[in-house]
Structure formats: structure tokens, C-alpha cells
């Protein structure tokens, strides 16, 4: 019996246990305390309460499974000579890392209870004559080493057999992502490309208008935005009138700053480009499809945004013009009017002082062109007429943009502004009367959006009670009316003076 059993280093003999992989005899304490199923799930095994008697655990019995105990993995290396023998005995060193499952029915039950736990925890070196070779494994008991991760083993004896789950395909992976996109009709692709090009053009105009609005509302009030005319000092004026009238003329030109607004051309050009893009959008091919409708909606809101930017820019410019003209008008007098107010008649002035109103005119620059003569001689009239021209052109561009967007000519902002005064007042009133009779409603999507923008115009007669949009439109109407009213008064006075000039 002693020849068939393994010998412990502490001279304690255990009962033989049949190996699960071989028919040979293995030391009793070479097996785990837990069965393979409990060990894999890392839970406490209830079947091996006694050291030597390995009965099936309760979990395996309840599940109706076979309770198997495998060999422990050595915690220290064998002697080099014995390790070399084990490696050379089998070409696959990973199979020696742990013993195969042992049937619970083959475990001996006659081992005494006197074996201590300290002795069972020691690793036992079997004698050199012990045969570790295992018989060939049957086909039904073969283990897939790739599935259990044994193919990654490096042959070391510190490796422990741990069941690992195989790499399963992700449930989120689908072949739909790799499937080719459905073919798109050439008409749909052409219409979508045209709408995208229109959006790019509208975006470029929108960015330019936003930059102009920022300059008008933030930068222009902080710096000199008008071109100053350098008054030339008169040299032939008499001492008693020269100094006062020369100072008056210099202040005129310095404070009024002859009207020359450089960015106004940029603003008008941007408005014309917007009108061109809107006309292209109106004549673009329309395709009945979801994509085409979405692209058209995006272009619609971008176009309305550009139109609102035009309204706000024109409002800010008109406020700057009116404030500058009023400040200059209240501070100084026109040199021509000043000369006439000082003397009751031209003959009396010439007889008493020996000078006429021509003496109030400053010296002219030798390179002064004819086109700048009027602004040099009468800067107030020139500024008023320039402001009227600016507002007139701006309102015309607004009206054309409204018509292109589908707004009736008598229902837009341009019509409400023109009714307050200025050129084309009678035509605008006639159109407004006809529109009130017809009571036409907005027909295009853009017109409906602009109608929402103009919805509070009915309450914008009083600026304080109107909303932000109503305040903007009311301010534009007020500046338009005041500037044209000042221009008409000044024009009538100038014509009256011209008619009173003797030949």
C-alpha cells in the first residue's frame, strides 16, 4: 500500500484519490477545498466541510450537476530537475497547471479525521519516482484551450486555471452601418445643391450686415465718422466783422462735418446683394421632398434675419443723422442767414459798412472741384439733402426686399415709413388705401414671418408702450419724418432767398 501512495514530507499518509484526468494515484491534499463550479463563481462551497471526505456540494446537488474538484495550483515552484522532467513529459505545459475534475463518487470516505489543517496547507513534493504522466483524454472530456484562455499561458507553474468568457459579438453591431446608402435621384440632389448654395450666399450677406450693424451702433458713436472739411482762413475781411464770422464759419464746418459716410456704400451694396439672392431663391427649382423643405425653411429664416438687420441698420443711421443735424442747427446759424439777419437790407449793409454778404464766404481752395462747391458753401443744406437721399435709397431697398419676400407693397415697413413724409408720399398713401380695401393677408411663408415681426405696429404709435420691434420701427419713422420736414423748410427758405436776390 505504501508503494502506491504519495508520501508527505511530514510523514503523514493520506488515502489515495483517483485523478480526474488520469487513472493514476495523486496525493489527497493536491485538490481544492471548493468544487470547480463554486471556485469559478468565487463563492463558498458547502460540500467540502470535512478535510478528507469530498461530498457533492449543496449547490451542485440542487442544480443537478456533477460536483467536480480539481487539483490545486502549486504556490511554490518545484525543484528545477523535477520541473524540467514535467515540461519534457508533455509538449503542452499548460495542461500541468491544474488537475482535471475528479468525480465525487470516486473520492475515498475512509480517511481519518485526525489530519490537521496545518499539514493539509503544505505543498508536498512527491518522490522522484512518482509518475505524473496522464493517460490520453477522451474526446468527450477534451477541453477547448482557446475557450478557457490556456493558449495565452506562458508555461509557468504560477498560472491558475480560471474560466474566462469568450469574446462574443456586440449586440449593437449591425450590418446596417456597412450597407450602402440608397441611391438619390438626380433631381433631388440638384435641388438640394442649389438650396445649399443659396444658404451660403445668404450667410455671407448676413455676416456682412451684422458687422455693419455693430459698427453703426457701437463704433460710430465713439469716434468721428464724418469727414471734416478744413476751413480756410479768410484774409480780406475787415477787422470789425472778420473774427466773429470767421469763428462762426469754422465751427459750422467742424461740428457739422460735411456729410460723407464711407460705410454707407457697403451697406447699400449688401442690401442689393441680398435682393439678388432673394430673387434667385424665388426662381429656384422646387422639389417636393422632406430635405428640400428643410433647406428652404433654413434659407427662409436666414433671409428674414438679413431683412431685419437692414431695418435696424437704417434706423441707427437715421438716428445718427438726425441728432447731428439738430445739434448743428441749434448751435450755429447758416452764414447766409447770419449775414442777412445782421442788416435790414443789402443796400444799407453795403453803404454803412462797405461790405456785402459775399464777405462771409471763406476763401476757396484752388483745387476745389465743382462737385464739392455746394457742400463747401452751404454745408447744412448739403447735409440735409444727403440725409434725405440716404433714407430714400434705404427705404427703396427695403421695399424691394419686402416684395421679393412676398410682402405686399402697402403692408411692409417701407410703406408705413413713406406715409410719414418724404418723396413718394402720395403714392404710398394711395397704395395703403387700396391695400386697406383689399385687406390682403400674407401669402408666402416669409411674409407670414415678417407679419409676426410687424404684429406690434398697431401699438407702436406711442414708443413707450410698444415692444422692441415697435420701438425700432417707430424710431425709423420718426427720424424719417423729422429729417424730411427740416429739408423741406430749409429748401423753401433757400428758394425764397434765391427769388429775392436782385439780378
Curated annotation (Swiss-Prot):
Main location: nucleus
Uses in industry and biotechnology: Lovastatin acts as a hypolipidemic agent that works as inhibitor of (3S)-hydroxymethylglutaryl-coenzyme A (HMG-CoA) reductase (HMGR) which reduces HMG-CoA to mevalonate and is the key step in cholesterol biosynthesis. Lovastatin, simvastatin and related compounds are widely used to treat hypercholesteremia and reduce the risk of cardiovascular disease. Furthermore, statins such as lovastatin were found to be anticancer agents.
GO biological process, one term: positive regulation of metabolic process
Keywords: DNA-binding, Metal-binding, Nucleus, Transcription, Transcription regulation, Zinc
InterPro entries for this protein: Carb_Metab_Trans_Reg, Zn2-C6_fun-type_DNA-bd_sf, Zn2Cys6_DnaBD
Composition-biased stretches (Basic and acidic residues): 339-349
GO cellular component terms given for this protein: nucleus
Matches recorded under SUPFAM superfamilies: Zn2/Cys6 DNA-binding domain (SSF57701)
Compositional bias of kind Polar residues: 1-14, 350-359
Record has Transcription as a keyword: yes
Molecular function via GO: DNA binding; DNA-binding transcription factor activity, RNA polymerase II-specific; zinc ion binding
Region Disordered, residue ranges: 1-21, 89-124, 331-362
DNA-binding region: 35-67
Induction or repression: Highly expressed during the first day of culture on solid medium; thereafter levels decrease but remain high. Expressed at much lower levels in liquid culture.
Keyword presence, Zinc: yes
Family annotation (Pfam families): Zn_clus
Compartment list: Nucleus
Coiled-coil intervals: none
PROSITE patterns in the record: ZN2_CY6_FUNGAL_1, ZN2_CY6_FUNGAL_2
Biological role stated in the UniProt entry: Transcription factor that regulates the expression of the he gene cluster that mediates the biosynthesis of lovastatin (also known as mevinolin, mevacor or monacolin K), a hypolipidemic inhibitor of (3S)-hydroxymethylglutaryl-coenzyme A (HMG-CoA) reductase (HMGR).
Name of this chain's protein: Transcriptional regulator LovE
Amino acid at each position: 500500500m505504501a508503494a502506491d501512495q504519495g508520501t508527505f514530507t511530514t510523514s503523514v499518509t493520506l488515502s489515495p484519490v483517483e485523478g480526474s484526468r488520469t487513472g493514476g494515484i495523486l496525493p489527497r491534499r493536491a485538490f481544492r477545498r471548493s468544487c470547480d463550479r463554486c471556485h469559478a463563481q468565487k463563492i463558498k462551497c458547502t460540500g467540502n466541510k470535512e478535510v478528507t471526505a469530498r461530498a457533492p456540494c449543496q449547490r451542485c446537488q440542487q442544480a443537478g450537476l456533477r460536483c467536480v474538484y480539481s487539483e490545486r495550483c502549486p504556490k511554490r515552484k518545484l525543484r528545477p530537475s523535477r520541473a524540467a522532467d514535467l515540461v519534457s513529459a508533455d509538449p503542452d505545459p499548460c495542461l500541468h497547471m491544474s488537475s482535471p475534475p475528479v468525480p465525487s463518487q470516486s473520492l475515498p470516505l475512509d480517511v481519518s479525521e485526525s489530519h490537521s489543517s496545518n499539514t493539509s496547507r503544505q505543498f508536498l513534493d512527491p518522490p522522484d519516482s512518482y509518475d505524473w504522466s496522464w493517460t490520453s483524454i477522451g474526446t468527450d472530456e477534451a477541453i477547448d484551450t482557446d475557450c478557457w484562455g490556456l493558449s495565452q499561458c506562458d508555461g509557468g507553474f504560477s498560472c491558475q486555471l480560471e474560466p474566462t468568457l469568450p469574446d462574443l459579438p456586440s449586440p449593437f453591431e449591425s450590418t446596417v452601418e456597412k450597407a450602402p446608402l440608397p441611391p438619390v435621384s438626380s433631381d433631388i440632389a440638384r435641388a438640394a445643391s442649389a438650396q445649399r448654395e443659396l444658404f451660403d450666399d445668404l450667410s455671407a450677406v448676413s455676416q456682412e450686415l451684422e458687422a455693419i450693424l455693430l459698427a453703426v451702433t457701437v463704433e460710430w458713436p465713439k469716434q468721428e465718422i464724418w469727414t471734416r472739411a478744413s476751413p480756410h482762413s479768410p484774409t480780406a475781411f475787415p477787422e470789425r466783422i472778420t473774427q466773429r464770422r470767421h469763428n462762426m464759419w469754422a465751427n459750422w464746418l467742424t461740428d457739422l462735418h460735411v456729410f460723407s459716410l464711407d460705410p454707407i456704400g457697403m451697406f447699400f451694396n449688401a442690401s442689393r446683394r441680398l435682393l439678388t439672392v432673394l430673387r434667385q431663391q424665388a426662381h429656384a427649382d422646387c422639389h417636393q421632398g422632406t430635405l428640400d423643405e428643410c433647406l428652404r425653411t433654413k434659407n427662409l429664416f436666414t433671409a428674414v434675419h438679413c431683412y431685419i438687420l437692414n431695418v435696424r441698420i437704417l434706423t441707427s443711421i437715421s438716428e445718427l443723422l438726425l441728432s447731428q443735424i439738430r445739434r448743428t442747427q441749434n448751435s450755429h446759424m447758416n452764414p447766409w442767414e447770419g449775414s442777412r439777419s445782421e442788416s435790414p437790407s443789402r443796400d444799407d449793409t453795403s453803404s454803412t459798412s462797405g461790405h456785402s454778404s459775399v464777405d462771409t464766404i471763406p476763401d476757396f481752395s484752388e483745387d476745389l472741384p465743382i462737385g464739392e462747391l455746394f457742400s463747401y458753401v452751404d454745408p447744412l443744406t448739403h447735409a440735409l439733402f444727403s440725409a434725405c437721399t440716404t433714407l430714400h435709397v434705404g427705404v427703396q431697398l427695403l421695399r424691394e426686399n419686402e416684395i421679393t419676400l412676398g410682402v405686399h407693397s402697402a403692408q411692409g415697413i417701407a410703406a408705413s415709413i413713406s406715409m410719414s413724409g418724404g418723396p413718394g408720399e402720395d403714392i404710398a398713401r394711395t397704395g395703403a388705401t387700396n391695400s386697406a380695401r383689399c385687406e390682403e393677408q400674407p401669402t408666402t411663408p416669409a411674409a407670414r414671418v415678417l407679419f409676426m415681426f410687424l404684429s406690434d405696429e398697431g401699438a407702436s404709435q406711442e414708443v413707450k408702450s410698444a415692444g422692441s420691434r415697435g420701438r425700432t420701427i417707430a424710431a425709423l419713422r420718426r427720424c424719417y419724418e423729422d429729417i424730411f420736414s427740416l429739408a423741406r423748410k430749409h429748401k423753401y427758405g433757400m428758394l425764397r432767398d434765391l427769388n429775392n436776390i436782385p439780378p
